[in-house]
């Protein structure tokens, strides 16, 4: 003991020495301060002396008073500093004296100090520090592990992004190559366009020159006809010029013979029945090039026209000789000779048409009425549509048809130009269609319908065209009927060339409406312009051939329009004369256009496929938009209370206790009955009685059922057995009139274990139902009790299927065994019994199911655009893990226009509110609900509501209620 005391004394003496040394250091410091103050006073005195010397040396005495005031201020400051320093020194001396006294007292009382208490306190302090450090280390290790995981994920994402960038770069290279190819093709197409434009300008210049020549020839022909009429007049009077009569007779006979021979040869050549059938059979196997057929037709027509030209030259020579002999030109003409010539030509035309009608298609031939009812000039139009189609397919063009019946062409020409310039009304169209039906009498009923459909008129837009001009632009008229998808996008010919031929294949009819009353009424008929001129050709090169034939027909129209006489010989001569002039022009154009058609045909096929694909995509989009189910759910139709995979409109308000009287009243109000109302999702309550949220016991039952998610606790069979008894006291349930059921052997049932999950059938739908079950009663009970028991009901909520019944005992939940089972089922390890109390869980779920009004922000993935916010009423369906919301509370407020929306909950994160979301009236933290679609950002009014929602969502997702973070 003495040694210990000696050691303590030595230690105490060492402490005193240290304190003395510290006091000495302080004294030395004070002395140093005194010396510094003395040095400063000396410096100030020297400055004062210097200033005095300067004053003596100064010549200006204006600043004397200023210097004096400065000196006074300096002296005052020095005096104040001296006072402060002296006070400091006195205080330090007093402190040193006090410390000396304390040291002496401590030294005297050192024997009484207990050193053990000091060491214990030091050890406790050290242990506490060590524990805190260990906790900090653990927390840091957890953070490091989390950061390492994040680093690994980021590395994987970076590698994936690098691969995607490589793919994008390769795709860009390929696209650039394709772009260069497309540009090259576009340049080639532009070059071709320029070449075609040049060719078209040349063609137009040639057509102008040809038209001028034709006009000259028409004037010559009129002069020749005047001479012929003069010769006929002289012959009837019986003059003495025999040579002139012989020449006239020879000319007439030659013209008639030529016309008859030409008609017979053409009809025999092109409309032989045996040759026509053979050619038609060959065409089914081997298609014929339309260019070759048209060239052959032109060559034959030119060879025939050469013979006629010789006869024209002879007639001219004879007419010149006759003009010298004729003296009187003013005498009246004789109608006998001219009428005989016209009747002969008409008879020949009738024969050729009848032979053509029988040779081409005897089945589809049309019965001709009496010639007295209609004019002879309309015979040419009695051909059916199928006959003309077969004639044109057998390589017989419009040139040969015009030679066969020239009278009809004159009427076609004049009606064609009148239809372009006139305005057709709907009444005229109806009247003309009726006339067509009266005139035509086909042999078969099937053919009758086709002819009537083809003869119908269609009101179309008219285009101003000059009838006197030789040109007739068809581009403007065809573009009105073409679709945008059928036009050439990359390769356009000039506006005069037709863009496509599909319309000509659709709208083809060669049957104009007929009208009784002679030539004048016929010329007033208004026929659509395209139904008179459109030929039927093969799909290969339609747009080119149509244009060529149209240009040639224009030339015929201009020649024949100015002619008033309808003589067969004159018409054939003029047409064949024009064909000979146009032969060189056509042969030069054919060789150039063949190559262009081959190039454009491929482009047209590609553009057609593109147009069809665009149409298909638009149809798919319309179907998809109509198939999407985003219907608005009305009030009292909460479909998400049932299984989320099958959308059913149900209302969990039906799970409340309902008496029989309310059900009967509701049946009277509802026309379909209470069960139909339940299936439709409507409330069973009468509309007059508002809903009151006072059934807290039933809400507790629903909240307790959320703890055992998708589990059947008791079935109907178990309720019927002896294991189930009744709560006879009925003390806590007199208000609702419901009976409580208690299990005798609660621990024996395997239904409470976490491993038993019932499997519902795939085809059956699962949704909550309200099942009313009558309770049992003993024979010993009174009549009143029996009546009360009979009216009482138990509403059971099925979680898995409709056959399952759920009734949870309340008394057993408060026991300790049930809390342990709850903890095991929810996987809440590491928590105290107070945290997993059933009452607290029930309150949380009850509050969340009833819902709160919270602030909702826009549903975006980032926190950048949070400008708009709105209040919504939110609640949770714990059975399906669904978050529901609406504009107002759908359970209290009236109105059926309130829409309910819902989303399945996947997770939750809590984030501090950024500057954009801060509000003084709301809580600072934000709940971000992770859903299947987009995150939902919510903000509660207070911290209490915020914590309740957070804990309830964690419980629903089978997570810990409280965060177990290590304390620091």
UniProtKB/Swiss-Prot annotation:
Coiled coil: 68-91, 152-240
Record carries keyword Cytoplasm: yes
Gene3D superfamilies per record: Pleckstrin-homology domain (PH domain)/Phosphotyrosine-binding domain (PTB) (2.30.29.30)
Keywords on record: Chromosome partition, Coiled coil, Cytoplasm, Meiosis
Gene Ontology molecular function, alphabetical: cardiolipin binding; cytoskeletal protein-membrane anchor activity; mitochondrion-plasma membrane adaptor activity; phosphatidic acid binding; phosphatidylinositol-4,5-bisphosphate binding
A GO-annotated cellular component: cytoplasmic side of plasma membrane
SUPFAM superfamilies to which the protein is assigned, alphabetical: PH domain-like
Domain of life assignment: Eukaryota
InterPro entries: PH-like_dom_sf, PH_dom-Mcp5-type, PH_domain
Any Pfam family: Mcp5_PH
Annotated S-S bridges: none
Start and end residues of each PH domain: 847-958
Subcellular location: Cytoplasm, Cell cortex
GO biological process annotation, one example: establishment of mitochondrion localization
Role summary: Involved in chromosome segregation. Facilitates nuclear oscillation during meiotic prophase I, the 'horsetail' phase, by acting as a dynein anchor. Essential for anchoring dhc1 to the cortex. Required for proper sliding of the microtubules along the cell cortex, which leads to the proper U-turn movement of the nucleus.
Name under which the protein is recorded: Meiotic coiled-coil protein 5
Biological source species: Schizosaccharomyces pombe (strain 972 / ATCC 24843)
Lineage, highest ranks first: Eukaryota, Fungi, Dikarya, Ascomycota, Taphrinomycotina
Gene symbol of the encoding locus: mcp5
């Amino acid at each position: 003991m003495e040694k210990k005391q000696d050691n303590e004394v030595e230690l105490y003496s060492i402490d005193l020495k240290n304190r003395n040394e510290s006091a000495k250091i302080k004294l030395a410091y004070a002395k140093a301060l005194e010396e510094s103050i003395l040095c400063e006073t000396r410096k100030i005195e020297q400055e004062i002396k210097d200033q005095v010397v300067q004053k003596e040396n100064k010549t200006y005495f204006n600043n004397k008073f200023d210097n004096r005031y400065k000196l006074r201020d300096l002296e005052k400051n020095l005096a104040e500093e001296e006072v402060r320093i002296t006070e400091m020194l006195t205080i330090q001396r007093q402190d040193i004296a006090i410390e000396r006294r304390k040291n002496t007292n401590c030294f005297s009382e050192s024997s009484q100090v207990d050193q053990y208490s000091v060491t214990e306190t030091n050890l406790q302090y050290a242990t506490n520090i060590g524990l805190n450090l260990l906790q900090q280390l653990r927390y840091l290790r957890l953070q490091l592990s989390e950061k390492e995981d994040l680093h690994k994920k980021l590395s994987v994402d970076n590698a994936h992004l690098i691969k995607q960038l490589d793919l994008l770069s390769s795709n860009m290279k390929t696209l650039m190559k394709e772009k260069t190819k497309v540009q090259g093709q576009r340049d080639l197409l532009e070059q071709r366009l320029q070449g075609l434009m040049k060719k078209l300008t040349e063609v137009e210049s040639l057509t102008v020159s040809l038209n001028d020549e034709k006009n000259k020839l028409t004037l010559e022909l009129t002069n020749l006809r005047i001479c012929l009429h003069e010769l006929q007049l002289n012959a009837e009077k019986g003059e003495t010029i025999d040579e002139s009569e012989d020449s006239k007779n020879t000319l007439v006979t030659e013209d008639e013979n030529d016309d008859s021979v030409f008609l017979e040869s053409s009809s025999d050549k092109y409309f032989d029945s045996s040759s026509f059938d053979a050619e038609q059979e060959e065409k089914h196997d081997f298609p014929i090039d339309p260019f070759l057929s048209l060239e052959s037709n032109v060559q034959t027509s030119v060879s025939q026209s050469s013979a006629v030209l010789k006869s024209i030259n002879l007639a001219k020579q004879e007419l010149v000789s006759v003009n010298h002999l004729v003296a009187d030109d003013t005498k009246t003409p004789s109608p006998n000779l001219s009428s005989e010539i016209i009747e002969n030509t008409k008879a020949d035309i009738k024969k050729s048409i009848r032979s053509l009608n029988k040779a081409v298609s005897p089945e589809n031939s049309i019965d001709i009425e009496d010639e007295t009812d209609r004019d002879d000039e309309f015979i040419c139009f009695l051909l059916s549509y199928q006959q003309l189609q077969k004639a044109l397919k057998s390589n017989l063009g419009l040139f040969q048809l015009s030679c066969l019946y020239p009278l009809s062409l004159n009427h076609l020409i004049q009606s064609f130009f009148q239809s372009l310039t006139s305005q057709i009304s709907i009444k005229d169209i109806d009247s003309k269609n009726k006339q067509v039906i009266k005139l035509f009498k086909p042999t078969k009923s099937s053919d009758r319908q086709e002819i009537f459909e083809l003869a119908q008129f269609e009101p179309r837009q008219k285009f101003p065209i000059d009838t006197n001009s030789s040109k007739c632009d068809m581009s403007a008229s065809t573009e009105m009927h073409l679709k945008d998808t059928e036009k050439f996008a990359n390769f356009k010919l000039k506006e005069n060339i037709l863009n496509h031929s599909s319309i000509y294949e659709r709208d083809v009819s060669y049957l104009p409406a007929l009208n009784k009353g002679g030539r004048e009424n016929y010329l007033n008929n208004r026929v659509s312009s395209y139904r008179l001129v459109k030929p039927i050709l093969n799909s290969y090169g339609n747009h080119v051939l149509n244009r060529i034939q149209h240009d040639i027909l224009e030339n015929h129209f201009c020649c024949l329009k100015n002619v008033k006489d309808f003589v067969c010989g004159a018409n054939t001569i003029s047409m064949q004369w024009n064909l000979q002039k146009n032969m060189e022009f056509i042969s030069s154009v054919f060789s150039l256009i063949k190559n262009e058609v081959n190039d454009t045909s491929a482009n047209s096929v590609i553009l057609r496929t593109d147009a069809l694909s665009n149409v298909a995509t638009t149809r798919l989009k319309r179907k998809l938009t109509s198939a999407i189910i985003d219907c608005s759910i009305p009030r009292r139709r909460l479909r998400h209370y049932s299984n989320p995979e099958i959308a059913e409109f149900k209302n969990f308000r039906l799970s409340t206790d309902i008496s029989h009287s309310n059900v009967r009243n509701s049946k009277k109000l509802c026309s379909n009955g209470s069960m139909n109302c339940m299936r439709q999702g409507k409330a069973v309550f009468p509309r007059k009685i508002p809903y009151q949220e006072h059934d807290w016991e039933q809400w507790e039952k629903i909240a307790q059922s959320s703890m055992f998610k998708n589990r059947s606790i008791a079935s109907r069979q178990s309720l019927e057995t002896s294991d189930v008894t009744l709560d006879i006291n009925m003390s806590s349930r007199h208000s609702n009139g419901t009976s409580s059921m208690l299990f005798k052997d609660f621990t024996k049932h395997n239904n409470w274990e976490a491993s038993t999950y019932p499997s519902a059938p795939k085809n059956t739908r699962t949704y909550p139902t309200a099942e009313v079950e009558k309770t049992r009663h003993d024979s010993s009970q009174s009549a009143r009790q029996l009546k009360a028991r009979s009216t009482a009901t138990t509403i059971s909520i099925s979680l898995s299927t409709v056959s399952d019944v759920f009734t949870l005992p309340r008394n057993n939940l408060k026991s300790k065994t049930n809390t342990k089972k709850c903890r095991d089922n929810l996987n809440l390890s590491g928590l105290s019994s107070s945290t997993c109390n059933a009452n607290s869980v029930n309150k949380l779920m009850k509050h969340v199911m009833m819902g709160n009004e919270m602030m909702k922000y826009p549903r975006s993935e980032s926190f950048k655009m949070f400008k708009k916010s709105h209040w919504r009423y939110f609640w949770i369906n714990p059975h399906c893990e669904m978050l529901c919301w609406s504009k107002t509370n759908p359970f209290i407020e009236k109105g059926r226009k309130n829409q309910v929306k819902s989303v399945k909950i996947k997770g939750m994160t809590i984030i501090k509110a950024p500057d954009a979301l801060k509000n003084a009236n709301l809580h600072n933290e934000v709940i971000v609900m992770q859903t299947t679609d987009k995150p939902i950002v919510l903000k509660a009014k207070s911290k209490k509501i915020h914590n309740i929602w957070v804990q309830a969502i964690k419980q629903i997702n089978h997570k810990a209620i409280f965060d177990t973070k290590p304390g620091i």
